[in-house]
Amino acid sequence: MRVLPATLLVGAASAAVPPLQQVLGRPEEGMSFSKPLHAFQEQLKTLSEDARKLWDEVANYFPDSMDHSPIFSLPKKHTRRPDSHWDHIVRGSDVQKIWVNNADGEKEREIDGKLEAYDLRVKKADPSALGIDPNVKQYTGYLDDNGNDKHLFYWFFESRNDPKNDPVVLWLNGGPGCSSLTGLFMELGPSSIDENIKPVYNDFSWNSNASVIFLDQPVNVGYSYSGSAVSDTVAAGKDVYALLSLFFKQFPEYAEQDFHIAGESYAGHYIPVFASEILAHKNRNINLKSVLIGNGLTDGLTQYGYYRPMGCGEGGYKAVLDEATCESMDNALPRCRSMIESCYNSESAWVCVPASIYCNNALIGPYQRTGQNVYDVRSKCEDESNLCYKGMGYVSEYLNKAEVREAVGAEVGGYDSCNFDINRNFLFHGDWMKPYHRLVPGLLEQIPVLIYAGDADYICNWLGNKAWTEALEWPGQKEYASAELEDLKIEQNEHTGKKIGQVKSHGNFTFMRLYGGGHMVPMDQPEASLEFFNRWLGGEWF
């Protein structure tokens, strides 16, 4: 969860950051980006004078350290298992051939979308071999994009309660470039991993009343692998649509249930795109009912204005930054906003990349240099090698065990919690600052949207998330923005009446502030997170 120096655990603004911050402090250890930048020189001649100046400034940040790393991720070492290993293989080319009669008696494809290049491999996992939720059905496998040599790993857990009727949820971590298996084992999955690298049962798992799919995406993240790369959110959305279409084709019993997409951090980019991709297909077997975004990065123009307030004592916790630093951030904000506005207007990497780098250095870098955890303003960064959390190291060690990789059918030679090359790819393609929040009004016309935020997070803080939801232009904006935050209390157990946060809602739009939660609310406040999750799936706010 460190900002990675460009990546966040669950990531979001972390990705481009650490390296950024390190560049300012120790240039020799800074981001090695000049290789792609040098390749841009001819293209720079075609840009406006202002744009050229921005790129010149970016290059000056890393004068000597830019030739050491490629911008594209290297392929992972892997060994593909034979088809005989898998219980089922769903061929997208076969699904593509299925035609049905519509209400008017006309022939049409049963499932829309370009699926012919995709296959889905499925294996029923043996929970007893892993010691993880042994009483629930589990499936693991890969989505294969055969035309582009891409292979996405997923892990499905059936609901502990009533799988024939409970909803299905897709969970996504962020980064970009961080594995969703981190969310599985550190936040909301059926087990966590302790210091002895052993699974520990989680009473507050989100599969208590829902079946959950954890997906390692984009490619080359976690157990996923590829000979090619994905470097923007829109491209990743095509893969997710294919996976869900083929998964629900194989398991029609789950396709009958309500389906929701949830995620955190950079999933604030992913989810508006992925949900829009699904809803764009008229004939689909994905029963999408809502989306949930936790501590997300969605509207940089609005959210970057709240780093100074959060770090300087205006977010409900004591100040981390001194007055001089706070003033410096105030002075940097107008230029940052101007650069993001230019990115929003052009959506060009030539404009969006400098905006990301300048704003992250100016508004996230000062906080990082304090040594405080960017994911939790209350604590120091305890383990820089694992994005501030020792638990992430435990998860990586567990998922790198040969017996675990064998049990889940993983095909890669090793597991990494975050792939920083992917992080850089997204950054240098301008994806970081693009205005994906503009897709949210279209979602609100069709499905409910929940934005929730742990109030101790810095990197994707609750102030910025509340602000962008109130600034969003949609038919219900006035009523939503004027709605007051109300107490959110536990209703479902012996702690009934306990205040766990605040909530405001109008129409299909809801915002929640969760008390005492950092960037990863389910990890910090497991009881509160399961409370609001179950009530949201039950339709309380929509």
From Swiss-Prot:
Signal sequence region: 1-17
GO cellular component terms listed in the entry, alphabetical order: fungal-type vacuole
InterPro entries: AB_hydrolase_fold, Peptidase_S10, Propeptide_carboxypepY, Ser_caboxypep_ser_AS
Residue numbers annotated as active site: S265, D457, H519
GO annotation, biological process: proteolysis
Pro-peptide positions on chain: 18-123
Enzyme class, spelled out: hydrolase
Disulphide-bonded residues: C178-C418, C312-C326, C336-C359, C343-C352, C381-C388
GO-annotated molecular function: serine-type carboxypeptidase activity
A Pfam cross-reference name: Peptidase_S10
Domain of life: Eukaryota
Function: Vacuolar carboxypeptidase involved in degradation of small peptides. Digests preferentially peptides containing an aliphatic or hydrophobic residue in P1' position, as well as methionine, leucine or phenylalanine in P1 position of ester substrate.
Protein name: Carboxypeptidase Y homolog A
Biological source species: Aspergillus flavus (strain ATCC 200026 / FGSC A1120 / IAM 13836 / NRRL 3357 / JCM 12722 / SRRC 167)
Highest classification ranks of the organism: Eukaryota, Fungi, Dikarya, Ascomycota, Pezizomycotina
